[in-house]
Amino acid sequence: MLTTPGIDARNGEYEAFGVPATILANFLRENGVVPEKCDLNSILFLLTPAEDMAKLQQLVALLVRFEKLLESDAPLAEVLPSIYKQHEERYAGYTLRQLCQEMHDLYARHNVKQLQKEMFRKEHFPRVSMNPQEANYAYLRGEVELVRLPDAEGRIAAEGALPYLPGVLCVVPGEIWGGAVLRYFSALEEGINLLPGFAPELQGVYIEEHDGRKQVWCYVIKPRDAQSTLLKGEKL
């Protein structure tokens, strides 16, 4: 595993400039090397017995090349040609450091690393309002409604929601949307709009475009149906 600049190892605080690992990961993919996964500022490679010295040398050479491109602040069209071509209007004239700075600032503004920690600490877990099975049955019966992410706060999730990374369910059916989970998905929504081409994989939520902006939507239990299910102690 390698770490990229951006977080002070002494105190865990964001530095003024950083290199989000997803940018390095995309550069490596552009050049035939596929990392196993990457997080905010770390990237993981899996080595198998089949790997030979030539492949390791290729990886090292690409890392050195990326570092030189970063130092020279190379044009983004040279570093990530595929993403640049797909979103040329958005990234016209951009350099590598400029992209790194914008993405790093987004992470720092939302304190995304702290949100990731809180989502998996017991004291920050979403409050449970329904049995997951009951919530799933309500979903299958259509006793749900699709709402925008900001409107989901305080509502009961009808589906489990999973962002990759970290690739773990952050809210499960029957839990209340809110807290660190809602703020984390809100940060992802901003990133999807601000930095096209770097959208994370999301499951259990839905991306819809309205007036030129992509919005995150999710299914929640209809209030009266949820109350009825709880009061009756319905078993299916």
Which residues are covered by each model-predicted region?
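Non-catalytic terminal extensions of PLP-dependent enzymes
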Residues: 1-236
